[in-house]
Amino acid sequence: MIALASPHLDEIRQHGERDYPFECCGLLLGRFETSNKVVIQTYPISNAREEEAKRNRFLIRPEELMRGEKYAREKALDVVGFYHSHPDDHAVPSQYDLEHAWPTYSYIVVAVESSKATDVRSWEMEADRSRFNEEEILPLPLGEGPG
């Protein structure tokens, strides 16, 4: 399960809408609590793919990932996951997403149709990297963790 406040979900939706028709991407910063992840902050990153490929792929450059990890450490947070959008497609990870994901992290996918975010779902990869399982998104009041 991943827990986050509605303003964080709004930030993800708005990022997807702003970057439409291209994929947006970013980090989910927070903490691991037993089998749950709690998002404290989103960390938007510019999609580094070449322009035409941005319609159905995103790329986080290693230096951007390192910058985000450093920022998280400075705030006493961890990278607990990633988010990206699927323009004019479903909020379901693609085969490409599966091939490039890592276990343990959450992957939030926002569907954006005609510049409007329509669905947000979260996924976690099996430990053997064979597939994603959908995970529950627990909405939290801002500043709270799961009880």
Go through each PLM region and give its residues.
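Conserved, mostly hydrophobic/aromatic
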Residues: F82
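Conserved beta-strand-loop surface patch within small alpha/beta domains used
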Residues: M1-V79, P87-G147
